[in-house]
Each structure stands twice: as C-alpha cells, then as structure tokens.
Amino acid sequence: MKNAVIAIACAVLPSLVFGQEIPDRTRGVVHAHILPRFESLAHQSEHLANTAVADCSTASSALRSAYAKAFDAWLDTAHLRFGPTEVDNRAFALAFWPDRRGATPKALTALIQTQDPIIQTAKAYAEVSIAARGFYALEFLIYDPTLSITGDAAYRCALVRTITKDIENTTTKIHADWKNHYAARLTSPSDTGPYRSHDEAVQELFKALSTGLQFTSDTRLGRPLGTFDHPRPRRAEVWRSGRSSRHIKISLSALHDLAVRLAPADSNLIKKLVSAFDHALLKLAGLNDPVFASVVAPQARIKVEIVQQSVDEIRRIITEDLGPKLGVSAGFNAMDGD
C-alpha cells in the first residue's frame, strides 16, 4: 500500500510542478516569442510602405526586397491567429489565402480597369474586399505577368503604395494591441478577460501550435500535392514569387521555437521535438524545389510527400506527448476553437 502511494505521488508530482510553471512559460512565450515577432512585422511593414513611396515600380529590386522581408515577418507570426490578429479580420486582410475562387486577381483587375478612386487613401482602401488587400494581392501586382502590366502605370503605382500603407496600418494596430493590453490578458488571466485561467491561456498557445502545423501539412503541402493522378503545382502558395518552400521553412522554424518554449522542462520531450523539426526542415531543404513544381513527377513527388509525413510526425508528437504534458485533453481539435 505504501509503495502504491509513493508511486502515485511520484506520478502526480511532475504535473503539479509543471502546473506551477505554466504562468512562467506563458510569460516567456509572450515576451520572447510573440511580442518581438509582431514588433518586427510592424517595422518591416513600415519599411515596405516607405520603400513603395520611394519606388513603386513592380520591377524595382528595392520594392521586391522590402516585400520579401515584410512577408517573411508575417510568416513568422502567421500561426498566432487569436486576439489582435482576429479583430476586424486583420489576419485575412494581410493574408487572404487560399483563394479558391480566384477572387484576388478579379478584385485587383476591377480596380485597375475602372481606376477606382478608393485607392487614394489607405483608410478608404481598408473598406475594399479583403481579397484585394495584403501580401497576396501585392504578390499579384509585383509578380503576375498580366496584372503587373495591366491598365495605367500611374494607377498601378498608386495601388501598390496604398496596399503597402494598408499593410503598415494593419500590422501597427496588431502590434499596438499586443503590446498595450493583450499580452497582459494572456499572462494575467481574470474572470472578466478572454482567459479565466492560466490553463486556458496555455491551451490557446497549444492551439496556435497545432493549427499552424496542420495548415502547413494540409494546405501549404496538401494543395500542390493534390492526388497522385492529379497533382496541382499551381495551387502552391505564392508560386509566382518563388516563395512556396520558403513559407514552410519560416513557419516550421517559428513553430519550432513556440513548441520548445511551451514544452515543460522534460529533456526527452524537448529532444524529440527538436529532432522532429530538424528532420522536417532537412527534408524540405533537400527538395531544392522552391515552388513544388516536382509534384508532377512520381519519383520527385515522393520527396514532397516525405516532407508532409515529417510534418505530420511533429503533429503526432505535439498531440500525444506535448498535449498531455500541458493538460490539453486528447480529444481537443485545434480547428474546433475553444
């Protein structure tokens, strides 16, 4: 009987200790993972808008470089889909993808062909269709061989400047909300706030991790893979700018950082997480295929499928090992919300 009690105590003690660690880990995630990323996003978006003012030519190397840096900064935060990013559909205003009905090129073409005056200010432009806003709309204007030369050049220039300013305004608001009040709401739960306990706060972070991995596997990789008989390379994310693989690399790196910061002080679990993320990134780098064009070739397609399987292995570890450590129920589905 005594041995049984000791065994139970030993089993319960680690979970109690981790329960005491949860507030510290949540604060660590907020201050080391979330806030610096949104600050960088706001800074890079401001730089993009300023660059567009100086040179709005879609062939401009300076504009393309600033666009890439700002888009990278968004990818570094794109998994954090809660709180300030969801106010007024801000995340969708920055990143409307996948666009299954081709709404973005249609919306942009309509603006250009009619020379709609709504582009005169970013404030007014914030009322247009979300499909015509953000980084994916800007990719069409800069890299699409048709849209980049459609209509009046002066109007396209003004449109580029307005979209970049709209991006700056949106990311500045997200960063300000996180810095001024939402960080405190996540780290200091209350009965009147969005999180009533530290457990609810850590579940939000776990959901961001799980959903980010699921989106990478099912959408960023799943869409271009299609089926064996019908691969869809042109469904890859941002293939026009050659960034499809890069988006997965940045996202996995950000999720890696979140997973390790969220994990308890369990060396075996952390080693398992690090190994799984490193393996997926290594397989991704080995593709040497920026836009997943190789999915049409059976032998090369297998390599892309292996990357997807590697991401799914991370998801398994998150669900089966990390989830229970955090006290997230086994039946919790990241796509179901709270």
Question: PLM features: what roles do these ranges have?
Answer:
Residues 1-4:
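Positively charged n-region of N-terminal signal peptides that target proteins for export
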Residues 6-7, 17:
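Cleavable N-terminal signal peptides
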Residues 20-338:
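Mature extracytoplasmic or organellar-lumen-exposed domains after removal of signal/transit peptides
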